[in-house]
From Swiss-Prot:
Main subcellular localisation: cytoplasm
Source species taxonomy: Bacteria, Pseudomonadati, Pseudomonadota, Alphaproteobacteria, Rickettsiales
Catalytic activity: L-aspartate + 2-oxoglutarate = oxaloacetate + L-glutamate; L-arogenate + 2-oxoglutarate = prephenate + L-glutamate
GO cellular component, one term: cytoplasm
Subunit structure: Homodimer.
Naturally occurring in which organism (per UniProt): Rickettsia felis (strain ATCC VR-1525 / URRWXCal2)
Protein name: Probable aspartate/prephenate aminotransferase
Residues annotated as site: Important for prephenate aminotransferase activity: 12
Keyword Zinc-finger on entry: no
EC assignment: 2.6.1.1, 2.6.1.79
Record GO terms (molecular function): glutamate-prephenate aminotransferase activity; L-aspartate:2-oxoglutarate aminotransferase activity; pyridoxal phosphate binding
Top-level taxon in the UniProt lineage: Bacteria
Keywords per UniProt: Aminotransferase, Cytoplasm, Pyridoxal phosphate, Transferase
Record: residues binding L-aspartate: 39, 125, 175, 375
Length: 409
Protein backbone atom coordinates (compact mmCIF):
# COMPACT_ATOMS: atom_id res chain seq x y z
CA UNK A 1 0.00 0.00 0.00
CA UNK A 2 1.47 3.35 -1.05
CA UNK A 3 1.76 6.09 1.54
CA UNK A 4 0.79 8.61 -1.17
CA UNK A 5 -2.92 9.16 -1.72
CA UNK A 6 -4.44 8.38 -5.11
CA UNK A 7 -5.95 11.87 -4.86
CA UNK A 8 -2.67 13.19 -6.22
CA UNK A 9 -3.14 11.25 -9.45
CA UNK A 10 -5.52 13.94 -10.67
CA UNK A 11 -3.27 16.93 -9.97
CA UNK A 12 0.24 18.11 -10.76
CA UNK A 13 2.72 20.57 -9.24
CA UNK A 14 2.38 24.20 -10.30
CA UNK A 15 4.28 24.58 -13.61
CA UNK A 16 4.94 28.27 -13.01
CA UNK A 17 6.57 27.50 -9.67
CA UNK A 18 8.61 24.80 -11.41
CA UNK A 19 9.94 27.39 -13.87
CA UNK A 20 10.83 29.72 -11.00
CA UNK A 21 12.63 26.88 -9.20
CA UNK A 22 14.66 25.93 -12.28
CA UNK A 23 15.54 29.57 -12.89
CA UNK A 24 16.80 30.03 -9.33
CA UNK A 25 18.89 26.86 -9.63
CA UNK A 26 20.52 28.12 -12.84
CA UNK A 27 21.18 31.54 -11.32
CA UNK A 28 22.74 29.89 -8.29
CA UNK A 29 25.02 27.99 -10.66
CA UNK A 30 26.19 31.28 -12.14
CA UNK A 31 24.18 31.24 -15.38
CA UNK A 32 23.09 34.69 -16.63
CA UNK A 33 19.36 33.97 -16.68
CA UNK A 34 16.66 36.61 -17.06
CA UNK A 35 13.51 35.36 -15.38
CA UNK A 36 10.20 36.32 -16.98
CA UNK A 37 8.28 33.51 -15.31
CA UNK A 38 7.21 34.85 -11.93
CA UNK A 39 3.80 36.43 -11.45
CA UNK A 40 4.52 39.11 -8.87
CA UNK A 41 5.12 42.87 -8.97
CA UNK A 42 8.72 44.04 -9.04
CA UNK A 43 8.19 46.98 -6.65
CA UNK A 44 8.41 46.71 -2.88
CA UNK A 45 5.54 46.76 -0.40
CA UNK A 46 4.89 50.45 0.43
CA UNK A 47 6.52 51.70 3.63
CA UNK A 48 3.27 52.64 5.39
CA UNK A 49 2.11 49.02 5.09
CA UNK A 50 5.38 47.66 6.42
CA UNK A 51 5.25 50.13 9.30
CA UNK A 52 1.75 48.93 10.21
CA UNK A 53 3.09 45.38 10.44
CA UNK A 54 6.05 46.47 12.56
CA UNK A 55 3.70 48.32 14.90
CA UNK A 56 1.53 45.21 15.19
CA UNK A 57 4.58 43.19 16.23
CA UNK A 58 5.70 45.79 18.77
CA UNK A 59 2.17 46.04 20.15
CA UNK A 60 2.09 42.28 20.68
CA UNK A 61 -0.60 41.64 18.11
CA UNK A 62 0.65 38.09 17.69
CA UNK A 63 -2.24 35.91 18.87
CA UNK A 64 -5.09 34.08 17.17
CA UNK A 65 -7.79 36.13 15.48
CA UNK A 66 -11.22 35.16 14.20
CA UNK A 67 -10.88 32.20 11.84
CA UNK A 68 -12.50 34.10 8.96
CA UNK A 69 -10.44 37.27 9.57
CA UNK A 70 -10.54 40.03 12.13
CA UNK A 71 -13.55 42.39 12.06
CA UNK A 72 -11.39 45.48 11.42
CA UNK A 73 -10.01 43.96 8.23
CA UNK A 74 -13.42 42.74 7.12
CA UNK A 75 -14.73 46.27 7.65
CA UNK A 76 -11.90 47.62 5.47
CA UNK A 77 -12.86 45.10 2.77
CA UNK A 78 -16.52 46.06 3.07
CA UNK A 79 -15.56 49.73 2.68
CA UNK A 80 -13.36 48.92 -0.31
CA UNK A 81 -16.22 47.25 -2.19
CA UNK A 82 -18.56 50.16 -1.46
CA UNK A 83 -15.98 52.81 -2.36
CA UNK A 84 -14.54 51.23 -5.49
CA UNK A 85 -17.27 48.93 -6.82
CA UNK A 86 -20.46 50.40 -5.33
CA UNK A 87 -21.45 47.03 -3.86
CA UNK A 88 -22.71 46.53 -0.30
CA UNK A 89 -21.59 43.50 1.71
CA UNK A 90 -22.15 42.61 5.35
CA UNK A 91 -19.26 41.41 7.50
CA UNK A 92 -20.66 37.87 7.54
CA UNK A 93 -20.46 37.86 3.74
CA UNK A 94 -16.66 38.28 3.86
CA UNK A 95 -13.84 35.81 4.50
CA UNK A 96 -10.10 36.48 4.78
CA UNK A 97 -7.66 33.68 4.03
CA UNK A 98 -3.97 32.96 3.59
CA UNK A 99 -3.83 34.34 0.06
CA UNK A 100 -6.34 34.37 -2.76
CA UNK A 101 -5.38 30.79 -3.58
CA UNK A 102 -6.72 29.57 -0.25
CA UNK A 103 -9.92 31.54 -0.76
CA UNK A 104 -10.51 29.67 -4.03
CA UNK A 105 -9.52 26.33 -2.49
CA UNK A 106 -11.96 26.88 0.39
CA UNK A 107 -14.68 27.89 -2.05
CA UNK A 108 -14.49 24.70 -4.08
CA UNK A 109 -13.98 22.45 -1.07
CA UNK A 110 -17.10 23.95 0.50
CA UNK A 111 -19.32 23.84 -2.59
CA UNK A 112 -18.37 21.02 -4.97
CA UNK A 113 -19.58 17.43 -4.93
CA UNK A 114 -18.49 14.62 -7.20
CA UNK A 115 -19.89 15.19 -10.66
CA UNK A 116 -20.30 18.95 -10.30
CA UNK A 117 -18.83 20.77 -13.29
CA UNK A 118 -16.86 24.00 -13.37
CA UNK A 119 -16.51 25.95 -16.63
CA UNK A 120 -12.96 27.26 -17.00
CA UNK A 121 -12.08 29.44 -20.01
CA UNK A 122 -8.66 28.51 -21.41
CA UNK A 123 -6.05 29.83 -21.08
CA UNK A 124 -6.46 29.86 -17.31
CA UNK A 125 -4.48 30.39 -14.15
CA UNK A 126 -2.67 27.11 -13.58
CA UNK A 127 -4.24 26.25 -10.22
CA UNK A 128 -7.93 26.45 -11.14
CA UNK A 129 -8.31 22.93 -12.63
CA UNK A 130 -6.31 21.18 -9.92
CA UNK A 131 -8.24 22.85 -7.11
CA UNK A 132 -11.49 21.83 -8.79
CA UNK A 133 -10.22 18.25 -9.14
CA UNK A 134 -9.05 18.13 -5.52
CA UNK A 135 -12.57 19.13 -4.53
CA UNK A 136 -13.99 16.19 -6.59
CA UNK A 137 -15.37 18.54 -9.23
CA UNK A 138 -14.90 18.22 -12.99
CA UNK A 139 -13.21 21.03 -14.93
CA UNK A 140 -14.85 21.87 -18.28
CA UNK A 141 -12.48 23.79 -20.53
CA UNK A 142 -13.60 26.25 -23.18
CA UNK A 143 -10.81 27.34 -25.52
CA UNK A 144 -10.63 31.11 -25.88
CA UNK A 145 -7.59 31.76 -28.05
CA UNK A 146 -6.21 34.95 -29.49
CA UNK A 147 -8.92 34.86 -32.17
CA UNK A 148 -11.42 35.35 -29.30
CA UNK A 149 -9.28 38.02 -27.62
CA UNK A 150 -8.74 35.38 -24.92
CA UNK A 151 -12.27 35.96 -23.58
CA UNK A 152 -15.31 33.75 -23.15
CA UNK A 153 -18.25 34.87 -25.26
CA UNK A 154 -21.83 34.61 -24.07
CA UNK A 155 -22.51 32.14 -26.90
CA UNK A 156 -19.60 29.87 -25.93
CA UNK A 157 -20.71 30.00 -22.31
CA UNK A 158 -24.26 28.95 -23.13
CA UNK A 159 -23.03 26.03 -25.26
CA UNK A 160 -20.98 24.79 -22.30
CA UNK A 161 -23.69 24.80 -19.63
CA UNK A 162 -25.33 21.52 -18.61
CA UNK A 163 -27.53 20.54 -15.69
CA UNK A 164 -24.31 19.53 -13.87
CA UNK A 165 -22.68 22.96 -14.20
CA UNK A 166 -22.20 24.52 -10.78
CA UNK A 167 -19.59 27.22 -11.33
CA UNK A 168 -18.18 29.47 -14.03
CA UNK A 169 -14.76 31.05 -13.47
CA UNK A 170 -14.13 34.57 -14.76
CA UNK A 171 -10.66 36.10 -14.28
CA UNK A 172 -10.37 39.73 -15.35
CA UNK A 173 -7.78 41.07 -15.92
CA UNK A 174 -6.51 37.62 -16.70
CA UNK A 175 -3.49 35.59 -15.80
CA UNK A 176 -1.92 34.57 -18.21
CA UNK A 177 -3.20 36.91 -20.95
CA UNK A 178 -4.01 40.26 -19.37
CA UNK A 179 -7.30 40.20 -21.29
CA UNK A 180 -10.08 42.05 -19.47
CA UNK A 181 -13.86 41.96 -19.82
CA UNK A 182 -15.56 45.27 -20.53
CA UNK A 183 -19.04 46.29 -19.37
CA UNK A 184 -20.86 44.94 -22.43
CA UNK A 185 -19.07 41.58 -22.33
CA UNK A 186 -19.91 41.06 -18.67
CA UNK A 187 -23.48 42.19 -19.26
CA UNK A 188 -23.87 39.58 -22.01
CA UNK A 189 -22.53 36.88 -19.70
CA UNK A 190 -25.01 37.99 -17.03
CA UNK A 191 -27.86 37.63 -19.54
CA UNK A 192 -26.91 33.98 -20.07
CA UNK A 193 -26.60 33.34 -16.34
CA UNK A 194 -30.13 34.61 -15.73
CA UNK A 195 -31.40 31.74 -17.88
CA UNK A 196 -29.59 29.14 -15.75
CA UNK A 197 -30.22 29.78 -12.04
CA UNK A 198 -28.21 26.71 -10.99
CA UNK A 199 -24.95 28.22 -12.30
CA UNK A 200 -22.79 30.29 -9.93
CA UNK A 201 -19.83 32.50 -10.82
CA UNK A 202 -16.42 32.90 -9.24
CA UNK A 203 -15.01 36.27 -10.29
CA UNK A 204 -11.25 36.44 -9.71
CA UNK A 205 -10.45 40.17 -9.53
CA UNK A 206 -6.92 40.00 -8.13
CA UNK A 207 -5.53 42.24 -10.94
CA UNK A 208 -8.33 44.80 -10.60
CA UNK A 209 -6.01 47.76 -10.06
CA UNK A 210 -3.54 46.98 -12.84
CA UNK A 211 -5.29 48.20 -16.00
CA UNK A 212 -4.07 50.22 -18.97
CA UNK A 213 -5.09 52.78 -21.59
CA UNK A 214 -7.99 54.14 -19.52
CA UNK A 215 -9.66 50.71 -19.45
CA UNK A 216 -12.57 50.84 -17.02
CA UNK A 217 -12.67 47.85 -14.67
CA UNK A 218 -16.01 46.33 -13.73
CA UNK A 219 -16.72 43.34 -11.55
CA UNK A 220 -19.69 41.12 -12.38
CA UNK A 221 -21.63 41.74 -9.16
CA UNK A 222 -21.46 45.46 -9.89
CA UNK A 223 -23.06 44.99 -13.32
CA UNK A 224 -25.60 42.34 -12.26
CA UNK A 225 -26.68 43.08 -8.67
CA UNK A 226 -29.65 40.75 -9.13
CA UNK A 227 -27.14 37.87 -9.39
CA UNK A 228 -25.18 38.91 -6.30
CA UNK A 229 -26.17 35.81 -4.29
CA UNK A 230 -24.75 33.62 -7.07
CA UNK A 231 -21.50 35.55 -7.52
CA UNK A 232 -18.45 34.89 -5.37
CA UNK A 233 -15.72 37.51 -5.81
CA UNK A 234 -12.07 36.83 -5.00
CA UNK A 235 -9.54 39.59 -4.43
CA UNK A 236 -6.53 40.37 -2.28
CA UNK A 237 -3.62 42.66 -1.56
CA UNK A 238 -0.90 40.72 -3.39
CA UNK A 239 -0.79 42.47 -6.76
CA UNK A 240 -1.92 46.08 -6.24
CA UNK A 241 0.17 46.52 -3.09
CA UNK A 242 3.01 44.10 -3.94
CA UNK A 243 2.26 41.89 -0.94
CA UNK A 244 2.56 38.43 -2.51
CA UNK A 245 4.57 37.09 0.43
CA UNK A 246 2.25 38.50 3.08
CA UNK A 247 -0.43 35.96 2.08
CA UNK A 248 -3.71 37.82 2.49
CA UNK A 249 -6.61 37.21 0.14
CA UNK A 250 -10.30 37.73 0.64
CA UNK A 251 -13.61 36.66 -0.81
CA UNK A 252 -17.17 37.94 -0.69
CA UNK A 253 -20.34 35.97 -1.29
CA UNK A 254 -23.50 34.62 0.27
CA UNK A 255 -23.64 34.16 4.04
CA UNK A 256 -24.23 30.42 3.70
CA UNK A 257 -21.17 30.01 1.49
CA UNK A 258 -18.94 32.12 3.75
CA UNK A 259 -20.07 30.08 6.77
CA UNK A 260 -19.21 26.82 4.99
CA UNK A 261 -15.82 28.15 3.87
CA UNK A 262 -15.06 29.26 7.41
CA UNK A 263 -15.61 25.69 8.61
CA UNK A 264 -13.17 24.42 5.98
CA UNK A 265 -10.62 27.06 6.98
CA UNK A 266 -11.03 26.27 10.68
CA UNK A 267 -9.82 22.73 9.99
CA UNK A 268 -6.85 23.74 7.82
CA UNK A 269 -4.95 26.97 8.54
CA UNK A 270 -7.37 28.61 10.98
CA UNK A 271 -6.93 32.40 10.89
CA UNK A 272 -4.56 34.19 8.49
CA UNK A 273 -1.40 35.70 10.01
CA UNK A 274 -2.41 38.39 12.52
CA UNK A 275 0.46 40.68 11.53
CA UNK A 276 -0.33 40.38 7.83
CA UNK A 277 -3.96 41.22 8.58
CA UNK A 278 -2.90 44.49 10.22
CA UNK A 279 -0.74 45.28 7.19
CA UNK A 280 -3.69 44.53 4.90
CA UNK A 281 -5.90 46.96 6.84
CA UNK A 282 -3.37 49.69 6.18
CA UNK A 283 -3.14 48.74 2.50
CA UNK A 284 -6.89 49.15 2.04
CA UNK A 285 -7.43 52.15 4.33
CA UNK A 286 -4.16 53.97 3.73
CA UNK A 287 -2.96 56.08 0.78
CA UNK A 288 -3.81 54.71 -2.65
CA UNK A 289 -1.88 57.29 -4.66
CA UNK A 290 0.87 54.89 -5.79
CA UNK A 291 -1.51 52.45 -7.50
CA UNK A 292 -2.05 54.42 -10.71
CA UNK A 293 1.66 55.28 -11.18
CA UNK A 294 2.55 51.61 -10.70
CA UNK A 295 -0.05 50.61 -13.31
CA UNK A 296 1.34 53.23 -15.70
CA UNK A 297 4.81 51.78 -15.14
CA UNK A 298 3.52 48.33 -16.08
CA UNK A 299 1.86 49.82 -19.15
CA UNK A 300 5.21 51.23 -20.32
CA UNK A 301 6.77 47.81 -19.84
CA UNK A 302 3.95 46.18 -21.78
CA UNK A 303 4.50 48.57 -24.66
CA UNK A 304 8.26 47.99 -24.63
CA UNK A 305 7.89 44.21 -24.71
CA UNK A 306 5.28 44.36 -27.46
CA UNK A 307 7.41 46.67 -29.60
CA UNK A 308 10.22 44.10 -29.66
CA UNK A 309 8.31 40.81 -29.75
CA UNK A 310 6.06 42.00 -32.60
CA UNK A 311 9.17 42.08 -34.78
CA UNK A 312 9.49 38.29 -34.55
CA UNK A 313 7.83 36.82 -37.65
CA UNK A 314 6.77 33.67 -35.81
CA UNK A 315 4.80 35.56 -33.15
CA UNK A 316 1.30 36.97 -32.88
CA UNK A 317 0.82 39.31 -29.92
CA UNK A 318 -2.31 40.45 -28.11
CA UNK A 319 -2.24 43.88 -26.47
CA UNK A 320 -3.55 43.23 -22.95
CA UNK A 321 -5.79 45.61 -21.05
CA UNK A 322 -4.32 44.73 -17.66
CA UNK A 323 -2.21 42.52 -15.35
CA UNK A 324 1.50 42.22 -16.25
CA UNK A 325 1.71 39.37 -18.75
CA UNK A 326 1.97 38.80 -22.47
CA UNK A 327 0.59 35.54 -23.83
CA UNK A 328 2.30 35.24 -27.19
CA UNK A 329 1.14 32.94 -30.00
CA UNK A 330 4.19 31.07 -31.24
CA UNK A 331 2.87 27.99 -33.07
CA UNK A 332 4.38 29.16 -36.38
CA UNK A 333 7.75 28.19 -34.99
CA UNK A 334 6.68 24.60 -34.34
CA UNK A 335 8.34 22.13 -36.69
CA UNK A 336 11.44 24.22 -37.21
CA UNK A 337 14.92 23.15 -36.14
CA UNK A 338 17.27 24.77 -33.68
CA UNK A 339 20.97 25.19 -34.46
CA UNK A 340 21.64 21.95 -32.60
CA UNK A 341 19.21 20.09 -34.86
CA UNK A 342 16.39 19.67 -32.36
CA UNK A 343 12.87 20.13 -33.73
CA UNK A 344 10.62 22.45 -31.74
CA UNK A 345 7.37 20.51 -31.54
CA UNK A 346 5.41 22.35 -28.84
CA UNK A 347 5.46 25.17 -26.30
CA UNK A 348 7.46 23.12 -23.81
CA UNK A 349 10.19 22.64 -26.41
CA UNK A 350 10.16 26.32 -27.23
CA UNK A 351 10.40 27.38 -23.57
CA UNK A 352 13.33 24.99 -23.12
CA UNK A 353 14.97 26.40 -26.23
CA UNK A 354 14.66 29.97 -24.94
CA UNK A 355 16.12 28.93 -21.60
CA UNK A 356 19.08 27.20 -23.25
CA UNK A 357 19.73 29.52 -26.19
CA UNK A 358 18.52 32.94 -24.98
CA UNK A 359 18.98 32.36 -21.25
CA UNK A 360 15.44 33.67 -20.73
CA UNK A 361 12.89 31.84 -18.58
CA UNK A 362 9.29 31.88 -19.86
CA UNK A 363 6.31 29.64 -19.14
CA UNK A 364 4.96 27.37 -21.92
CA UNK A 365 1.36 27.98 -22.92
CA UNK A 366 0.34 24.38 -22.32
CA UNK A 367 0.77 25.07 -18.58
CA UNK A 368 -2.24 27.38 -18.91
CA UNK A 369 -4.27 24.92 -20.93
CA UNK A 370 -3.61 26.31 -24.42
CA UNK A 371 -0.89 24.94 -26.68
CA UNK A 372 0.87 27.17 -29.17
CA UNK A 373 1.67 30.07 -26.84
CA UNK A 374 4.14 31.16 -24.17
CA UNK A 375 3.76 33.59 -21.28
CA UNK A 376 6.14 36.27 -20.15
CA UNK A 377 5.79 38.43 -17.08
CA UNK A 378 7.00 41.98 -17.64
CA UNK A 379 7.11 42.68 -13.91
CA UNK A 380 10.84 43.40 -14.00
CA UNK A 381 13.07 46.38 -14.72
CA UNK A 382 12.84 48.11 -18.12
CA UNK A 383 16.50 47.32 -18.75
CA UNK A 384 16.17 43.62 -17.96
CA UNK A 385 12.90 43.36 -19.90
CA UNK A 386 14.40 44.97 -23.00
CA UNK A 387 17.44 42.70 -22.86
CA UNK A 388 15.26 39.60 -22.40
CA UNK A 389 13.01 40.45 -25.35
CA UNK A 390 16.01 41.17 -27.58
CA UNK A 391 17.49 37.81 -26.56
CA UNK A 392 14.21 36.09 -27.50
CA UNK A 393 14.16 37.91 -30.85
CA UNK A 394 17.77 36.92 -31.52
CA UNK A 395 17.16 33.28 -30.56
CA UNK A 396 14.19 33.08 -32.94
CA UNK A 397 16.30 34.56 -35.71
CA UNK A 398 18.73 31.65 -35.52
CA UNK A 399 16.05 28.98 -36.00
CA UNK A 400 15.98 27.14 -39.33
CA UNK A 401 13.01 27.97 -41.54
CA UNK A 402 13.52 24.96 -43.81
CA UNK A 403 12.54 22.05 -41.59
CA UNK A 404 9.13 21.15 -40.20
CA UNK A 405 7.31 18.35 -38.43
CA UNK A 406 5.72 17.42 -41.74
CA UNK A 407 9.12 16.79 -43.24
CA UNK A 408 8.96 19.76 -45.62
CA UNK A 409 12.23 20.67 -47.27
Amino acid sequence: MSIISTRLNSIKPSPTLAVVKKTLELKKAGVDIIALGAGEPDFDTPDNIKEAAIKAIKDGFTKYTNVEGMPLLKQAIKDKFKRENNIDYELDEIIVSTGGKQVIYNLFMASLDKGDKVIIPAPYWVSYPDMVALSTGTPVFVNCGIENNFKLSAEALERSITDKTKWLIINSPSNPTGASYNFEELENIAKVLRKYPHVNVMSDDIYEHITFDDFKFYTLAQIAPDLKERIFTVNGVSKAYSMTGWRIGYGVGSKALIKAMTIIQSQSTSNPCSISQMAAIESLNGPQDYIKPNALNFQKKRDLALSILKRVKYFECYKPEGAFYLFVKCDKIFGHKTKSGKIIANSNDFAEYLLEEAKVAVVPGIAFGLEGYFRISYATSMEELEEACIRIERACGSISIKSSLRGDA
